Amino acid sequence: MQTAQRRRFLLQSAALTVVGAGLPASWAAGKIKPGERAALIVVDVQNCFVPGGTLPVAKGDEVVPVINRIAAAFENVVVTQDWHTQGHASFASTHAGKKPFETTQLSYGQQVLWPDHCVQGTDDAALHKDLQVPKAQVILRKGFHQHVDSYSAFEEADRKTSTGLAGYLKQRGIKTVFVTGLATDFCVAWTALDAKRLGFETYVVEDATRAIDLNGSLDAAWKNMKAKGVKRIQSSDIEVA
């Protein structure tokens, strides 16, 4: 190989190395192919969070067909379910004089107060009827402790009480997680941030989520996730056989 040709070849090779440095080994031709060490986390796709529910996320039902499609690409799937007691501490109705979407101070810090939602055993708390994730091995219920809310699938809002999900995933050899569901700026974001902090390579599939967007919370969530190294992708970035 002539000197000029060799120089061009080395420069091109170096450029490819730099471009690919931040991508997983399974990323080829612009697509991610989840392997046996990847897990899909489906967050709170429940009747309470879709139109007609007690805490509806705008267009929340639109995530269902997206999740159903990409779920086929995963051998490991975890589904979470918000599962509150009657009179839960996160409900505005529990606090005299408080209205939904106001805040209050609880023992673990500031808490957004919500309408009563996802109460254990009700149809409102059930998973969406059209959600089809046949490979799901675990349904993780969260938010069932009376005095503590739980946005994250990994840890409750007191930042002390683990749900056990991290240990479960690590025991199965999972290295990478893809987070989907409701709502982007609360339970999805908290789950993604905790996953990254706990050592998992973490992706949020944007078009498989929808947001509440309370006082700019969506923009803040994306900025925070980006700053912490959570990757933002679309469902079209995932290779589905």
Stretches found by the model and what they are:
Residues 174-190, 204-210:
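Glycine-rich anion-binding loop/nest that anchors nucleotide
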Residues 1-17:
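N-terminal secretory signal peptides and thylakoid transit peptides that target proteins
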Residues 189-197:
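Histidine-anchored nucleotide/phosphate-binding helix
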